[in-house]
A protein has these predicted regions:
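Hydrophobic anchor at the beta1->P-loop junction of P-loop NTPases
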Residues: 168
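Hydrophobic positions on the alpha1 helix immediately C-terminal to the Walker A/P-loop
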Residues: 179, 183
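Conserved lysine of the Walker
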Residues: 176
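Conserved substrate/cofactor phosphate-moiety recognition/catalytic segment
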Residues: 185-200
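Nucleotidyltransferase catalytic core that binds NTPs
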Residues: 2-165
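The conserved Walker
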Residues: 172
Length: 200
């Protein structure tokens, strides 16, 4: 299959990764011989570690042989500090350096459409392609605020990070098994039976 672009870039903090990101990565990968997914990170601003986000993206895109993941660090401790022209300009320089070759296509969401930001940072050598975020209407901010309320948008590879685990300990014949079953029913989840019940 002939790809429209030789080298593409899709960047973000992916903090956390959600199905909208995966949707856009798959679309971008279908258009490029090589797609670089660039994770922006800064120690102190992260809600999930850069290593965790790297693993999530790697495990979600492992089947896409043309997807490469890179990381770029910045020093902005807040989102407001990061969202300034100086940080974006430095970020673009860092991204170009880590990719190390001309970038034909830059992919981003329609929330940036009309700002001219990506065109100024990557043009004219890069075409900026906007993906409509309304196709998968979620953002990382929503998930950070209430993960369980946006559970359907959290990829399966990320869900264990958000799942709550409860361990019930106690002497035998005190009602642990019944309690665990009732909790699982009440919270619409699963449970693991006591090992001793089946093996002893």
């Amino acid at each position: 299959m002939s790809m429209k672009y030789k080298t593409g870039m899709f960047g973000g903090s992916f903090d956390p990764l959600h199905t909208g990101h995966i949707h856009d990565i798959i679309r971008a990968a279908a258009m490029c011989r090589e797609l670089y997914v660039v994770i922006s990170w800064c120690r102190g601003r992260e809600s999930t570690s850069k290593e965790m986000r790297y693993r999530w993206i790697l495990n979600s895109t492992r089947h896409l042989s043309n997807v490469m993941i890179r990381m770029v660090e910045d020093q902005a401790l807040t989102k407001e500090e990061y969202d300034t022209p100086g940080y974006w300009e430095q970020g673009a320089r860092d991204i170009k350096a880590v990719i190390g070759k001309p970038i034909d296509a830059v992919f981003c969401g329609t929330d940036y459409l009309g700002t001219g930001r990506f065109e100024a940072l990557y043009g004219p050598e890069s075409q900026v392609i906007y993906f409509d975020r309304s196709e998968v209407p979620v953002c990382s901010t929503d998930i950070r605020a209430w993960a369980l309320g946006h559970w359907d948008y959290i990829p399966s590879v990320c869900r264990d990070y958000y799942a709550r685990h409860v361990l019930v300990l106690g002497s035998e014949s005190t009602g642990k098994s019944t309690l665990v079953r009732n909790l699982a029913l009440a919270y619409n989840t699963n449970y693991v039976s006591e090992a001793g019940r089946d093996t002893c």
